[in-house]
């Protein structure tokens, strides 16, 4: 059993198995009860007896002063539970923290009283008196208190923890308070089935707290720095002692010194760990990237990660680019936060829970596989459709080789009708219709062929008639098939609107196009996108059961082009007069403005309604159709009066009266045919409004019926937008990471510069400005001091030269370079090394007040002149004794008088020389000051950022 497992116990120990051990422990405590501070070699042990069931005697080093307050707090806590233990203590013992000697005395008294309690309570947890402290398992408060005791014993000076790392790095030390960890354990329901791993555990107090409160199967802390690891080992030892003293059970725990990114820890982190705690608040981006790629991506399913900085965001969808992100295999939620959750700040710090869920990525790949299968199946169906189309094309080619005339006519008939579903589709083999011959040419050919056929033999004519009848039958059959055939909905938007309107007028148009008057100019072939509306005679549209018009062969029997044609009956005004050419041209222009079948039907209906109204105006005064269009139904709900029947032509007098010229009403677009657009068809915006209307109508129909193609396109658009959104979010995340890295680099650079400038504790811009001003002021003061000192040095050097000679400064510098300087010897050396013609200068007191004591020479003093006198002064006493007093007196007066005149001249000369030297020195000092100021300004200019 390892050292870390020494404190592990069963939650329900056997009383019979523990009684012998308890008896032995009582004997051991009795042997040591008389001595509370035991000498062990050079140190001492502080002994404290336990009153808890299965508790062991606590022995702490007695030579460490910081442990005595911990023992005092323990005694105080036990006495608050058992009031009888304070009988031997003096009054007011718990008011203030006593000294070390007083704590030792209290410990001795406590051991004396606690011994009988331990004997009486042996074999019982005594939870009635000890409350939660008597339980074998730790509650939240008990685990917190025991961990705090161990922390205070292991770390005598917590401030030392803030000195072993560099500021603003990933090794920055910060502690999570025990209250926050207890809240996390309760919220995540961490228990004996979990393996708790703290990456960057510091001194390991969270590992010990988890082992005490959650009793995990294993709690491991990994720390890189050496100093916190040493404290963690001490903390583990004291934690085991305190747990044994209080008789508590705890799980296995271990503190490891090393880098948690080392591959040797990967099995522990990725395979065994179920709960991982990472205080990544100060981790830089590079370290977080390594953690994500080297550890988090390999975690097993269900692993829970608690962090102080969010690892990822809850993205709803996974894209191909985000499959390698932590968000693709995890869910992130915010945990509850207590007050003062961390030690480095009083602000609110969030804690995040990231749960590994590999099923997210599995579901994503399954969805991708299903989409690929659907796509491949669609492609296979398209290929099969293409094969069918190829077969049809080859079949049509074979038919064209056998019956070229028949195929050509069939294609022309199909091209003339715009109901072909594939006439404008880009993905089909569409052949544009051949140009039809002009109607006049066809009429001439038919008329020329009629008289020629009358001269043939009877048998040949009969056979020719049979062939003509067969051809007519075939053509009628083809015509009926085309008319009955339901067209396929086209794909292009231009043909989308024509599919919702009746198309019978397209078939009638070919047979009646030649019924127009010769004054109307019509194109030889209608436009592919805007077929003109038909001009069908009224009798042909009398009823819905009217048979289709005659085939082209029957139309060959029509009269020649040169014969005058009767005006169409639908262009005959109900007033009895025929419309003039100008009005007919206007009507045809209006009809040609239609681009879709719906517009053509609406225009024809409007024209019919206008022509059916009786009017008293003459045909020549008939205005354009726009002036006679009926008002919208929504505004004028009263229907117009029934139109009067048109007068019959002379050749049709015996026939029944023709029905009104009205287009058949379509139930789907009845409102459109009754002019609900509220604008005339000739308006420039009419086509655009109608096209928008039908496009919106088709869109609504597809939405209501949930068209698979429409739903598929909509889903593809949604997926594309979601992918775009995911890419933008990922780009934002990468950009934010880069910004954070740059900000961290800038902050580190700023901190290093502030450390160099002596401002390591700056936390605000105001403090930075104040420190900058202080540095500038200090620099100015130092500059002034240097200038003054240089001035003083120059003055002193000049004085030294004046007094000691030109080489005095050199001797002085050489002597000052030695550690021990003898001023007397230096003075003698200066004096002896003077040149023979050296004359000591006199310094005036006004110019050099500091040198008046050392080097000022009085004008009346002869000490400075004695070395220059060849003869010594005569002794006045000897002169008096020799009887030459008068001579001596006169000689003395002469000497005094002569000496006084020479001294005055010498003094004046020395004064002039001194003034000259003083001026030179002053000029030199000023020049130095000027240079110093210039250098300072240049240095200041260089420091200013550009």
Swiss-Prot record:
Residues 54-369 form the DOT1 domain. It is found in: Nucleus; Chromosome. CDD domains: AdoMet_MTases (cd02440). Its main location: nucleus. The keyword Transferase applies. GO terms for cellular component: chromosome; chromosome, telomeric region; histone methyltransferase complex; nucleus. Residues 880-903 have a biased composition (Gly residues). InterPro entries: DOT1_dom (IPR025789), H3-K79_meTrfase (IPR030445), SAM-dependent_MTases_sf (IPR029063). Disruption phenotype: RNAi-mediated knockdown results in the ectopic expression of the neuronal identity-inducing transcription factor che-1 in the epidermis. In contrast to other lysine histone methyltransferases, it does not contain a SET domain, suggesting the existence of another mechanism for methylation of lysine residues of histones. Interacts with zfp-1 (via C-terminus) to form a heterodimer known as the zfp-1-dot-1.1 complex or DotCom complex. Histone methyltransferase, which in complex with zfp-1, methylates 'Lys-79' of histone H3 to activate transcription. During stress, the zfp-1-dot-1.1 complex also plays a role in the deubiquitination of histone H2B sites, which negatively modulates the RNA polymerase II-induced transcription of highly expressed genes. Involved in controlling tissue-specific gene expression, particularly in the epidermis. PANTHER family: HISTONE H3 METHYLTRANSFERASE, HISTONE-LYSINE N-METHYLTRANSFERASE, H3 LYSINE-79 SPECIFIC. This is Histone-lysine N-methyltransferase, H3 lysine-79 specific. It comes from Caenorhabditis elegans. The gene is dot-1.1.
């Amino acid at each position: 059993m390892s050292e870390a497992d020494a404190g592990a116990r069963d939650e329900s120990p056997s009383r019979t198995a523990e009684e012998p051990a308890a008896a032995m422990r009582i004997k051991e405590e009795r042997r040591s009860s008389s001595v509370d501070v035991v000498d062990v070699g050079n140190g001492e042990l502080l002994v404290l007896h336990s009153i808890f069931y299965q508790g062991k005697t606590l022995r702490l080093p007695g030579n460490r002063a910081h442990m005595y307050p911990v023992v005092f707090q323990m005694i105080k806590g036990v006495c608050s539970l058992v009031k009888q233990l304070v009988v031997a203590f003096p009054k007011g013992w718990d008011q203030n923290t006593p000294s070390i000697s007083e704590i030792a005395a209290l410990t001795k008294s406590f051991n004396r009283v606690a011994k009988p309690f331990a004997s009486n309570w042996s074999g019982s947890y005594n939870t009635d008196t000890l409350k939660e402290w008597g339980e074998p398992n730790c509650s939240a408060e008990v685990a917190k208190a025991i961990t705090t005791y161990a922390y205070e014993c292991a770390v005598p000076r917590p401030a030392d923890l803030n000195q072993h790392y560099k500021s603003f790095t990933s090794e920055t030390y910060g502690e999570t308070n025990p209250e926050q960890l207890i809240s996390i354990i309760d919220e995540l329901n961490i228990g004996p089935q979990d393996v708790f791993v703290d990456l960057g555990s510091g001194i390991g107090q969270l590992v010990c707290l988890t082992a005490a409160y959650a009793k995990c199967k294993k709690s491991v802390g990994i720390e890189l720095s050496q100093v916190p690891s040493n404290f963690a080992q001490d903390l583990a030892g004291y934690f085991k002692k305190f747990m044994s003293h209080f008789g508590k059970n705890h799980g296995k725990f271990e503190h490891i010194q090393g880098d948690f990114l080392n591959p040797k820890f990967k099995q522990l982190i990725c395979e065994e760990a179920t709960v991982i705690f990472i205080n990544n608040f100060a981790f830089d981006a590079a370290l977080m990237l390594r953690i994500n790629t080297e550890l988090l991506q390999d975690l097993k399913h269900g692993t829970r990660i608690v962090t102080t900085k969010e690892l990822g965001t809850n993205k709803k969808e996974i894209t191909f680019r985000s499959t390698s992100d932590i968000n693709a295999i995890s869910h992130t939620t915010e945990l509850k936060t207590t007050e003062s959750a961390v030690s480095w700040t009083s602000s609110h710090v969030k804690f995040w829970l990231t749960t590994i869920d590999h099923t997210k990525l599995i579901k994503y790949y399954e969805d991708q596989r299903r989409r690929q299968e659907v796509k491949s199946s669609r492609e296979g169906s398209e290929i099969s459709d293409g094969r069918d189309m190829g077969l049809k094309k080859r079949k049509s080619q074979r038919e064209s080789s056998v019956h070229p005339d028949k195929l050509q006519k069939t294609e022309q008939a199909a091209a003339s009708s715009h109901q072909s579903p594939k006439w404008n589709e880009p993905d089909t083999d569409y052949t544009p219709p051949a140009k039809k011959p002009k109607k006049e040419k066809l009429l001439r050919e038919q008329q020329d062929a009629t008289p020629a056929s009358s001269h043939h033999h009877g048998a040949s004519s009969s056979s020719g008639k049979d062939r003509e009848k067969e051809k007519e039958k075939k053509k009628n059959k083809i015509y009926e098939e085309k008319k009955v055939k339901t067209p396929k909905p086209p794909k292009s938007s231009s043909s989308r609107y024509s599919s919702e309107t009746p198309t019978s007028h397209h078939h009638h148009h070919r047979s009646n196009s030649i019924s127009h008057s010769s004054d109307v100019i019509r194109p030889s072939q209608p436009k592919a996108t805007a077929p003109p509306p038909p001009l069908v005679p009224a009798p042909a549209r009398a009823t819905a059961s009217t048979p289709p018009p005659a085939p082209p062969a029957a139309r060959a029997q029509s009269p020649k082009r040169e014969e005058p044609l009767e005006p169409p009956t639908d262009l005959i005004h109900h007033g009895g007069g025929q419309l003039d050419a100008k009005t007919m041209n206007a009507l045809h222009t209006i009809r040609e403005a239609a681009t879709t079948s719906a517009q053509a039907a609406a225009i024809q209906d409007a024209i019919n309604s206008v022509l059916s109204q009786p009017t008293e105006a003459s045909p020549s005064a008939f205005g354009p159709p726009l002036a006679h269009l009926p008002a919208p139904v929504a505004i004028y709900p009263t229907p117009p009066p029934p139109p009067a029947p048109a007068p019959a032509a002379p050749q049709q007098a015996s026939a029944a009266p023709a029905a009104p010229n009205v287009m058949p009403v379509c139930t789907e677009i009845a409102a459109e045919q009754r002019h609900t657009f509220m604008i005339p068809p000739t308006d420039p915006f009419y086509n655009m409004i109608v096209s928008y209307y039908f496009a919106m109508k088709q869109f609504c129909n597809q939405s209501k019926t949930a068209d698979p193609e429409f739903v598929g396109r909509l889903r593809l658009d949604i997926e594309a937008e979601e992918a775009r959104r995911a890419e933008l979010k990922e780009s934002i995340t990468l950009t934010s990471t880069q910004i954070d890295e740059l900000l961290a680099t800038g902050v580190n650079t700023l901190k290093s510069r502030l450390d160099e400038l002596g401002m390591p504790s700056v936390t605000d811009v105001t403090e930075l400005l104040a420190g900058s001003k202080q540095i500038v002021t200090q620099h100015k003061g130092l500059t002034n001091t240097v200038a003054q000192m240089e001035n003083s040095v120059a003055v002193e050097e000049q004085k030294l030269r004046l007094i000691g000679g030109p080489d005095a400064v050199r001797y002085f510098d050489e002597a000052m370079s030695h550690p021990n300087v003898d001023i007397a010897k230096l003075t003698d050396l200066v004096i002896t090394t003077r040149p023979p013609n050296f004359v000591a200068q006199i310094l005036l007191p006004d110019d050099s007040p500091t040198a008046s004591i050392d080097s000022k020479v009085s004008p009346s003093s002869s000490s400075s002149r004695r070395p220059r006198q060849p003869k010594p002064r005569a002794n006045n006493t000897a002169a008096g004794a020799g009887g030459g007093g008068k001579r001596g007196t006169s000689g003395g007066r002469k000497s005094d008088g002569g000496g006084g005149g020479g001294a005055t001249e010498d003094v004046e000369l020395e004064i002039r020389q001194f003034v000259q030297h003083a001026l030179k020195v002053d000029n030199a000092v000023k020049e130095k000051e000027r240079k110093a100021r210039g250098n300072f300004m240049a240095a200041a200019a260089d420091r200013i950022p550009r």
